[in-house]
């Protein structure tokens, strides 16, 4: 978000966090499609140029299954490296999605590890500083992967801690590809020096704005 704020000059960026339906990771594909449709409708009155599903779980489970209502949709999807042994860390729902099943079928060197509850633990850490027992949650994973794909937009927040557990791994995230797609989807960018305006909508708007101003989303 911070990079978009500085890159997309003169734009208004709306951020909505769907706390009402969390967690996404334990929901079925059909449930996630309904949630995506409902949340997309919240943005339509603002006539957005682009709507971003900034969640791997939502992105992988709704690909080709949602009505974009004439709006450009950008999704955050897991990234892999062909021909290199890798580990995809993700939610249970992401692991069960058709997208990841196909990804696994096409990449025999890819292991998929759904980490139950990790996204929620990261939320608790962000909100109240509760320590995450990463080593315990990932105790069954090998430590010698060539790369680790962060298949949840929460996971980059703890990348430094993950690096301690996977010291040999390169870390990948689909967020970079999504960022490029967002920037390319905006056809007019002001040349003035002022950045974009970031607005938070929904019941938790005030709390999100506070966290954002504290730099919690600096790497998100």
Where are these predicted regions, by residue range?
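Non-catalytic structural scaffold of enzyme domains
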Residues: 1-220
């Amino acid at each position: 978000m911070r990079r978009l704020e500085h890159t997309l000059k003169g734009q208004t960026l709306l951020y909505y966090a769907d706390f009402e339906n969390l967690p996404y990771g334990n929901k079925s594909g059909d449930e996630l499609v309904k949630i995506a449709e409902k949340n997309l409708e919240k943005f339509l009155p603002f006539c957005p140029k682009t709507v971003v599903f900034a969640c791997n779980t939502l992105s992988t489970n709704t690909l080709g299954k949602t009505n974009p209502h004439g709006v450009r949709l950008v999704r955050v999807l897991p990234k892999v490296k062909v021909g290199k042994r890798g580990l995809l860390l993700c939610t249970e729902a992401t692991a069960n999605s058709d997208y990841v099943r196909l990804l696994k079928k096409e990449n025999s060197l890819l292991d998929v590890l759904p980490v139950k509850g990790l996204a929620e633990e990261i939320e608790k850490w962000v909100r109240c500083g509760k320590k995450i027992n990463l080593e315990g949650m990932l105790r069954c994973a090998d430590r010698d992967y060539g790369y680790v794909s962060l298949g949840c937009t929460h996971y980059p927040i703890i990348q430094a801690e993950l690096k301690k557990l996977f010291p040999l791994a390169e870390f990948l995230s689909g967020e970079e590809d999504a960022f490029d797609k967002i920037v390319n989807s905006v056809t007019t960018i002001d040349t003035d020096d002022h950045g974009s305006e970031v607005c938070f909508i929904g019941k938790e708007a005030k709390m999100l704005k506070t966290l954002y101003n504290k730099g919690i989303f600096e790497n998100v």
